[in-house]
Amino acid sequence: MAFINENYLKLPGSYLFSEIARRVDNFRKENPNAKIIRLGIGDVTKPLAPAVIDALHKAVDEMAKEETFKGYGPEQGYSFLVSKIIEYDYMPRGIRLDEDEVFVSDGAKSDTGNFQEIFGLDNKVAVTDPVYPVYVDSNVMAGRTGKYLANGYFENITYLPCTAENNFIPELPKEKVDIIYLCFPNNPTGMTLSREELKKWVDYARENRAIILFDSAYEAYIREKDVPHSIYEVEGADEVAIEFRSFSKTAGFTGTRCAYTVVPKKVVAYTKNGEAHQLNSLWNRRQTTKFNGVPYIIQRAAAAVYTPEGQKQTKETIDYYMENAKIIKQGLEDIGLTVFGGVNAPYIWLKTPDGISSWEFFDIMLKEINVVGTPGSGFGPSGEGYFRLTAFGSRENTLEAVERFKNLKF
């Protein structure tokens, strides 16, 4: 008899965005003529930059010729891409990295979900709350979280509430933790940490031999000068932090899949008898066993993001989305809602009015004005009473959604 991994049975219901899709599909069947505007899941809508498309075409042509054909590539990524990542994303901020500290992958979702595999099951995990569901769910699957409780928490996870009451800035945990997930600019709240606030976490990790898993997938959307783009801008972070980045939101690669993870060789974790081991070598071992690398043509496309044309074109797209964020934020404030985010991130986090629950507000938005967002409670118990909208729609749909907001009744 084959036995299942019973930890999967601890996962509550379906994945958040699957549940949203189910509800929207049911509504569409009952209302086939409704024009639904989707401001929920964070998928982009603008096409890939011309420089990226040109590089894709050239790479595809290379694959058609015997002398330039590429088969299996390095699991860690081709040097032509890794060198550009270091040159453009880190060196201008005074951060020095070796090429073997950067691992190209098929997505930050994959890496943030998979990185926990190299840690023991008895590590104490801390997450901000609300939080991107992958961080928690992947630890549930591994068997690290204990039981799911009636209050929406897992018994062995330390939750760090981020609400309007603390300006969405998580406090250091009162109990000792070993693995800390941080995402800034934050998904879902759209809020950020200053360099001083981030330093507190680095200092905590250094003092407690903890590891920070830092998701900075939205760093390209930062507008304010005092907001760090990388955790490695903080002294000592290269001893305790892993950083995840993605081309998905930076350059529209949600459908082409390319990202990277930085694992400095200084970062170590320990065996039970106290022996230190580099996470870099462990992650490399994991990747070479379970991952065959990102396709050559996709990495050529990603490298084109760093050309002068690619930089200009991707910045224009990011500016487009951030203008959408400004429009949504202003539109919601104009009808009297309390709104956060949308300044350094493409996410708008609003307080639901009159004590309405997150899912109740979802249903009101869908049924009354045919606009889809994401219930805050889907990101964790501290997200109850909040709602996320994204700026990744078209300008036309964004403006139309803002007009529809005026018809909301609550």
From Swiss-Prot:
InterPro entries assigned: Aminotransferase_I/II_large, DapL/ALD1, PyrdxlP-dep_Trfase, PyrdxlP-dep_Trfase_major, PyrdxlP-dep_Trfase_small
UniProt keyword list: Aminotransferase, Pyridoxal phosphate, Transferase
One MF annotation (Gene Ontology) recorded for this entry: pyridoxal phosphate binding
Binding site for substrate: 15, 42, 109, 132, 187, 292, 388
SUPFAM superfamilies reported for this sequence: PLP-dependent transferases
Protein EC: 2.6.1.83
Class in the EC hierarchy, top level: transferase
Binding residues for pyridoxal 5'-phosphate: 72, 108-109, 132, 187, 218, 246-248, 257, 292
Subunit structure: Homodimer.
Protein family membership: Belongs to the class-I pyridoxal-phosphate-dependent aminotransferase family. LL-diaminopimelate aminotransferase subfamily.
Name of the molecule in the record: LL-diaminopimelate aminotransferase
Lineage: Bacteria, Bacillati, Bacillota, Clostridia, Eubacteriales
